[in-house]
Regions:
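Extended, compositionally biased accessory segments flanking or bridging domains
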Residues: 1-92
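Charged, structured surface patches that assemble and position nucleic-acid processing machinery
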Residues: 59-75, 85-86, 94-98, 120-182
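Short, flexible loop segments at the rims of nucleotide/cofactor-binding pockets, characterized by
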Residues: 101-103, 201-202
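Residues immediately flanking
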Residues: 102-105, 130
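A short, acidic, amphipathic alpha-helical segment used as a generic capping/interface helix at domain edges
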Residues: 105-116
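Phosphate-binding P-loop
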Residues: 211-215
């Protein structure tokens, strides 16, 4: 949207180069505005700019909603360090991620119900072309934790406000920032009960400790 590009240009972080500005502009312009604007190529590029490695994108519909299926590459294992500690969007990411595009303002309850009724069985992402306030997100989290906490796949919601915030981040910081801003409002358990292998990302930030283990 033009207003978002104008905001970005007026609030460009100090030290940004022309390349940073162009990257942010492209990220903003790939955002879907209205059902007719959704196309697979734009969604694929949007998620590549967000920090995923998307091989291809297929557009579809579920009920009355526009969806896209991303075929993605998971993060490599045994790296020296990771950008974030969330394995389902890293080394344990599935080969396909569903993206749902919703348009128009709705209450927190309506938003959750509209997403849940689509019957998606694995973690997915909602792009909401509307604005969520802090109160909206808290209401959304409360409804998820108390009413939709059994048998429902986790999903992350990116609204226009968050999308603009992400545009103002450098490209390698967008995915970690998105997870930090969305995971508190959904159900996700990064830990496993009992014994078992630990995802590489769980050593996030512990570079020296991880190096010492590998050198043993």
């Amino acid at each position: 949207p033009r207003w978002a590009v104008q905001y970005m240009k007026k609030n460009t972080p100090e030290g940004w180069t022309t390349r940073h500005i162009e990257d942010a502009r492209r990220f903003i312009e790939k955002w879907p505005v209205g059902k007719q604007s959704v196309n697979a190529q734009n969604i694929q590029e949007y998620f590549n700019l967000l920090g995923f490695h998307v091989e291809c994108c297929a557009k579809s519909t579920r009920g009355n909603e526009v969806c896209c299926t991303l075929t993605v590459h998971k993060t490599e294992q045994n790296l020296a360090d990771y950008r974030h500690p969330i394995s389902i969007f890293g080394t344990q990411m599935k080969s396909q991620i569903e993206v749902v595009c919703l348009f128009g303002k709705r209450t927190a309850t309506q938003l959750i119900d509209d997403a849940c009724k689509l019957g998606i069985t694995s973690t997915f992402i909602v792009l909401l072309d509307a604005d969520l306030s802090t109160a909206d997100r808290r209401a959304m989290a409360k409804y998820v934790f108390t009413q939709k906490n059994v048998g429902q796949a986790s999903f992350l919601v990116i609204d226009r406000v968050l999308a603009l915030y992400l545009a103002m981040q450098s490209s390698n910081e967008r995915l970690p920032a998105m997870l930090q801003c969305t995971l508190p409002y959904t159900i996700y358990q990064p830990f496993t009960n009992g014994s078992g292998s630990t995802a590489d990302e769980m050593f996030f930030g512990r570079v020296s400790e991880l190096a010492s283990i590998r050198d043993m």
